[in-house]
């Protein structure tokens, strides 16, 4: 199950796109029977969260807050929360030439990859789908591809 909490107005068509992308990525990881929450916020909120939890005073596109520790024998029904800044996602979507809806859906797959226990080197501003390389990035590329294939093509 995918819950969406919109603290900022979501772009048109986001709910079905988010559901399709995350369902595909969850299936990819074998966690389609689990739950995640996606929270849409602005730069001010995500900046405050990043400062509080990571000690970095800057906005970002996506943060993940898992409800379990990788390696624990019990994976809870709710995997955690994915927080996405619509402001940052909007700038990235414009730079990449696709819709905000598509950007948010793909960022959610990145957040899910963290929720299931994967991490990557810090690479602020480097899109995981556009040049982040190395074995630690492959799982993020795979989840992004699963999500991308579930989305309808854009005009």
UniProtKB/Swiss-Prot annotation:
Q: Which domain of life is it from?
A: Bacteria
Primary enzyme class: hydrolase
Q: Which PROSITE patterns match?
A: UPF0054
- Name one molecular function that GO assigns to this entry: metalloendopeptidase activity
Cofactor: how and how many bound: Binds 1 zinc ion.
Please cite one Gene Ontology biological process associated with this protein.
rRNA processing
EC annotation from Swiss-Prot or TrEMBL: 3.1.-.-
In terms of Pfam families, this protein maps to: YbeY
Q: Which GO terms of the cellular component aspect does the record hold?
A: cytoplasm
Per UniProt, the keywords (alphabetical) are: Cytoplasm, Endonuclease, Hydrolase, Metal-binding, Nuclease, Ribosome biogenesis, rRNA processing, Zinc
Which InterPro entries does this UniProt record tie to the protein?
MetalPrtase_cat_dom_sf_prd, YbeY, YbeY_CS
Its annotated compartments are: Cytoplasm
Cofactor names from the entry are:
Zn(2+)
UniProt: Zn(2+) binding residues: 110, 114, 120
The family annotation for this protein states: Belongs to the endoribonuclease YbeY family.
Concerning NCBIfam families, the annotation shows: rRNA maturation RNase YbeY (TIGR00043)
The protein's job, in short, is: Single strand-specific metallo-endoribonuclease involved in late-stage 70S ribosome quality control and in maturation of the 3' terminus of the 16S rRNA.
Under what name is this protein listed? Endoribonuclease YbeY
